[in-house]
């Protein structure tokens, strides 16, 4: 019997004993989840919690949906004072929680065979797994099929424009008065780097791109400089919205598919969390001509078929919590193939839980078909820049590559020097 299965069995026996003793009050645990403005994800989490409460009468859950930035702010203080929730939302790019000893390994509670093998390393340290990887994603380039065609650009059957072809798309969009690339960095530390770093991945290939993110390759490398120069040209042509610096992530979705509208939108595939909400709640209008193209192939690129795959929204257990049995049982109840299938069906997004694609029934089957096509025969690189960058390097990435460089406020040379100063290992 797997360790997680054994723990669940023992916990169940403990609950039975407590029940037979009578009069025992249920144990209430607290849970903080992200996604207050993403209905499908919110409904999925709520349903899993309610199912758990129905099955485990000795545990109840006080569930709160809180914006991610607020969770992080509150949790950073709460874990130190002993006031953190029993279970809370976390992403792998917040290593200080694990480094500080604030997270409990889930191995003793969860059957790890129910997690995708590629998702476990994101939460593994010293042989232990510390997070339940519910949300996974690839970085995609969404586009408005009608608008792109209207400005005179034909997307080939490969769904991948050349470097010159994407430059032409930007020029034609600007000439037609349509923003070529919807993007904003008003409330996130990463969107401004998506186009550049996906281009760098395709230019360098997985090995050298990994060296770049690990501080082993200079941003002054000629291939990196060439790619940065190309993206700087797109910026100078007017690729991004004039409101780039203040446009928030949710607003950039609306900007793309509602008002004023844009040709393309680089975004992780959790795009669907907002896009598939009702139009009145900020989602895509009915009949929106959504397409997915590959990021452009770089001239002389080592890996035009490369793509980023990553783990995002996960749930962790507070190591100093007093109700870890109930908290662990909750995560164990979530980690099933059926729940993974329901996530993909309801949210239209990848998951680190194992699932059965043959059982997925969705009103967004056309979207799934195109997403699967864009991810066929690709070479994945695991993790985004902020999964690798830490401390001063991460701060510099946010200041330079997320903000100043795509806003046209800094040169290629200066951006490379600042990144090397903060990130390049001696």
Give the ranges of each region predicted by the language model.
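Extracytoplasmic/periplasmic solute-binding protein
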Residues: 130-133, 139, 165-216
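Extracytoplasmic/periplasmic substrate-recognition and gating elements
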Residues: 25, 54-55, 151, 237, ...
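Glycine-centered hinge/linker elements that transmit conformational signals in sensory
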Residues: 168-172, 213-245, 295
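A structural signal for short loop-to-beta-strand junctions that line the ligand-binding cleft
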Residues: 86, 113-148, 169, 179-180, ...
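C-terminal capping/gating helix-and-loop segments adjacent to ligand/active sites or protein-protein/ligand interfaces
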Residues: 309, 349-357, 369-423
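Extracytoplasmic "Venus flytrap"/periplasmic binding protein-like
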Residues: 47, 51-117, 146-154, 254-256, ...
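Hinge/lid segment of periplasmic solute-binding proteins
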Residues: 90-140, 167-169, 195, 287-295
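Extracytoplasmic "Venus flytrap"
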Residues: 28-46, 388
């Amino acid at each position: 019997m797997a360790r997680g299965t054994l723990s669940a069995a023992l916990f169940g026996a403990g609950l039975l004993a407590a029940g037979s003793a009578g009069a025992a009050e249920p144990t209430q645990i607290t849970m903080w989840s992200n996604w207050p403005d993403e209905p499908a994800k919110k409904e999925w989490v709520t349903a899993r919690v309610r199912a758990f409460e129905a099955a485990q009468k000795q545990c109840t859950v006080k569930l709160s949906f809180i914006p991610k930035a607020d969770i992080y702010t509150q949790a950073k203080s709460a874990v130190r004072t002993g006031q953190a929730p029993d279970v809370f939302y976390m992403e792998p790019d917040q290593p200080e929680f694990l480094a500080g000893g604030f997270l409990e390994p889930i191995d003793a509670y969860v059957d790890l065979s129910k997690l995708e093998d590629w998702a476990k390393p994101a939460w593994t340290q010293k042989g232990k797994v510390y997070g339940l990887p519910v949300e996974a994603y690839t970085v995609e380039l969404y586009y408005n099929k009608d608008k792109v065609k209207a400005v005179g650009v034909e997307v080939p059957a490969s769904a991948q424009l050349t470097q010159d072809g994407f430059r032409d798309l930007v020029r034609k969009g600007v000439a037609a008065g349509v923003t070529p690339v919807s993007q904003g960095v008003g409330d996130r530390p990463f969107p401004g780097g998506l186009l550049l770093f996906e281009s760098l991945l395709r230019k360098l290939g997985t090995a050298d791109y990994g060296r770049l993110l690990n501080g082993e390759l200079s941003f002054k490398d000629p291939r990196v400089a060439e790619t940065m120069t190309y993206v700087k040209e797109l910026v100078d042509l007017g690729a991004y919205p004039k409101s780039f610096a203040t446009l928030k992530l949710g607003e950039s979705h609306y900007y793309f598919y509602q008002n004023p509208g844009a040709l393309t939108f680089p975004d992780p595939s959790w795009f669907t969390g907002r896009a598939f909400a009702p139009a009145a709640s900020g989602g895509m209008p009915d009949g929106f001509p959504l397409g997915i193209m590959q990021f452009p192939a770089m001239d002389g690129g080592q890996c035009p078929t490369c793509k980023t795959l990553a783990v995002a929204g996960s749930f962790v257990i507070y190591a100093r919590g007093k109700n870890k049995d109930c908290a662990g049982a909750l995560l164990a109840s979530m980690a099933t193939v059926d729940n993974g299938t329901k996530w993909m069906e309801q949210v239209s997004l990848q998951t680190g839980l194992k699932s059965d694609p043959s059982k997925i029934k969705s009103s967004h089957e056309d979207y799934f078909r195109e997403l699967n096509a864009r991810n066929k025969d690709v070479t994945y690189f695991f993790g985004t820049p902020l999964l690798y960058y830490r401390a001063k390097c991460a701060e510099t990435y946010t200041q330079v590559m997320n903000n100043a460089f795509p806003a046209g406020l800094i040169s290629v040379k200066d951006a490379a020097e600042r990144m090397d100063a903060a990130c390049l290992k001696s």
